Amino acid sequence: MAKIDKKTKLKLNKKSVRAPSKPTTEKKPKKYVTADTLTWKPVKTSSFSGIDGGGGMMMLEELEDVGIEWEETDGGRKIAKFVEVESKTSKGKKNAAQEEPNQEGRGDDEKASSASETEEGKKADDKEAVEEDDEEEFPDFAGFAEEDLNAADEEEHPNLDDEPAFNDDLLPEWSSISLHPSLKRSFLASSFTAPTAIQSRAIPAGITGRDVVGVAETGSGKTLAYSLPILHYLLGQRKSKAGIKRPLSALVLCPTRELALQVMDHLNALLKHALATPDGEKPQGPPRVSVGSVVGGLSAQKQKRILERGCDVIVATPGRLWDLIKADDELATSVRTLRFLVIDEADRMIENGHFAELESIVKLTQRSTAQQGPDDDDPVFQAMATLFEESTAREDMQTFVFSATLSKDLQKNLKRRSRSWKGKGKRSSTLEDLVEKLDFRDENPEVIDLSPEGGVVSSLRESMIESTKDDKDLYLYYFLLRYPGRSIVFVNSIDSIRRLLPLLTLLQLPVFPLHSHLQQKQRLKNLDRFKSNPKGILIATDVAARGLDIPQVDHVVHFNLPRTADAYIHRSGRTARAQNEGFALQLVSPDEKSVQRALMKSLERTHELPDLPIEAGFLPSLRERLRVATEIEKAQHRATKATHDKNWLLEAAEAMDIDIDPSMLDGEDDDPDAPYYKPKKQDRGKGKASVENLKMELKALLQEKLVARGVSIRYPTSGSKVIVDDLIKSTGHGMLLGASTSKAYDQVEKTGKRKLGSGRPGAVKKKKVEGR
């Protein structure tokens, strides 16, 4: 037997003395209660839950501090029984009462071993108990008097009268508009020295409480025209106290996600300079004015958290916002009590059948007279009364409506034959539609129409290239090489993007797609890449036609003509913004000629667009490059399609839990039109080899220099075009040897010489054959 020394025995005795005794808790018998004796609480549900169909659910109630046990009967059925459970508060008090005698007992044991140690432990325990009690009574503001809290709050949120005045001599053009001094300091920091025409007229009206309908050319600063009155109002209000959710004051509705995010960025950029400290640093704490976005394609949970935190301004697309409103009664109440409602690109937003959610959102802001319903006296319906139904729309809400076009004539489909308006009176205008759908508080809204003649800005020059449908790719490739710069190519379908994108990528052009089928993150990434590349090419549908303010877009190419004139105006408005020069090119095939004439007539043009000069000497080499790239694209498309069809067949068979005939996958069936057709191995090998050969051929063609007619590479000082000076000074064209470096803007005149509808010089006119 091992001996235990004195030191070890002493340690064991100390451990046994200090070991706390475990409290013995007696198990109480369960107390079952009936459903009638419980305290049921009604659950507040959304007022819009019935819109999507609630499955007949009219009302919900909930219970607290009740457990459920399931008892199985002889027949196998389960019956729920309610068990009374102690609430958390009572349970906490009992635990505290049980801990006190344990602490006293532990103190007695320690006293037997060491009296001094016990006294120190007792003091520490008493001190901790006092601190815990204080924390329970004052969780947030312990040790502060109410007067001190109010004083601290006033220091954190200073009085607005202490805002330093702005010296109008620094910005004399803005002196006539009485905006908040912080906004004018932001203008000075951003070198925004003078308002545009639409801003100088819309901002004073918005500040004085008027409803504004503004029509102005693209790139004229409409975003600031409606944003500045809102920010002026918000900066004039007291800051919301810490811990209190700030109310929603303004809602900006946009047709596309990209436009909504762009508007939010513009507002934040303006506020960044307006709210900066004198040192130019960002102020500490929550922002004075909070701006958030609610758009589709991004995390809905994150947007819900932003809304729950509270925002002064929300920029949203109607679809996602309405989805959140249907699930959140508090958000619906915030929209009903708005101070500002803004509809950007209004002509697009109010088109019939396009934005059904917009009408539902607008109805929330409409004033309606209270009517007694047949079920209002029913106690069940009274219990269902929600926060939204108890709220009322504001009488002082301001409505701002802005767009580049507000004309019904510009919204007609040009491919359809124009029909005479057979209704009584004149055809309703877009402004009349706005008055019907929007509840303007102003009896006579301020209508500002600054739309330019011809629909486009004066700094934009337009031209066209008439070609066959098959040669459009050739002339597009020529234009992008001949006039390098940031260009947007508009097409009418996503299929056109999917065809052009791999083609231009094979030709080593920096091209990026943008269409509605892309995920939102990918769309934003492509936009950022396009903005950062001075020679970037964006192939887009009309999703990029409205509102996007991309700096320094040199060219807009209408690969397919738009279906409406207002779409043409908005497409062309992506260039020539803020009085900068811009160029728009139309690629017109014979079957689009009638649409092009109708387009020009709807824009009240009297002359044809001038033709863009083409240097035909480059076309044969470009055509050969394009031919090889097209063959590669078709071969790759066939291989991708075959793999896709096979994968689809396997997934469908697995989903239906059926077996596939091996012949369908082994390629025994030689029908190339069948979805399960699989070429033989030797054919696949030949296909891969041919694609590799084509890629090598294209690589060699791309390395060859493109030389204009009359230029000699061996003898640069001879020939009809002397290029020796350009080679020495490096002033020639980077891609096309012998081509000039002039811009497309300088290659055409402002208007064409031929009248609209007149034949081309030298064209053979068809004679009408009259019947006998």
From Swiss-Prot:
What EC identifiers does the entry list? 3.6.4.13
GO terms (molecular function) for this protein are:
ATP binding; ATP hydrolysis activity; RNA binding; RNA helicase activity
Q: Which organism is it from?
A: Cryptococcus neoformans var. neoformans serotype D (strain B-3501A)
Q: Per its record, how is this protein called by name?
A: ATP-dependent RNA helicase MAK5
Note down the stretches annotated as region Disordered: 1-30, 84-138, 663-689, 748-772
Binding sites annotated in the UniProt record for ATP: 216-223
Q: What does this protein do?
A: ATP-binding RNA helicase involved in the biogenesis of 60S ribosomal subunits and is required for the normal formation of 25S and 5.8S rRNAs.
- Gene Ontology terms: biological process: rRNA processing
User: One GO CC term of this entry?
Assistant: nucleolus
**Top enzyme class:** hydrolase
Acidic residues compositional bias, start-end: 128-138, 663-673
Sequence motif DEAD box, residues: 344-347
Q: Which positions, given as ranges, span the membrane?
A: none
Q: Which reaction does it catalyse?
A: ATP + H2O = ADP + phosphate + H(+)
UniProt keywords (A-Z) are: ATP-binding, Helicase, Hydrolase, Nucleotide-binding, Nucleus, Ribosome biogenesis, RNA-binding, rRNA processing
Helicase C-terminal domain sequence ranges: 473-618
In its keyword annotation, does this UniProt entry include RNA-binding?
Answer: yes
| Lineage per the UniProt record | Eukaryota, Fungi, Dikarya, Basidiomycota, Agaricomycotina
| Motif Q motif: chain residues | 172-200
- Helicase ATP-binding domain sequence ranges: 203-424
Annotated S-S bridges = none
List compositional bias (Basic residues) regions by residue number: 8-17, 752-772
Query: Could you give the domain comment from the record?
Result: The Q motif is unique to and characteristic of the DEAD box family of RNA helicases and controls ATP binding and hydrolysis.
Instruction: Classify the main location.
Output: nucleus
Q: Where is the composition biased (Basic and acidic residues)?
A: 103-112
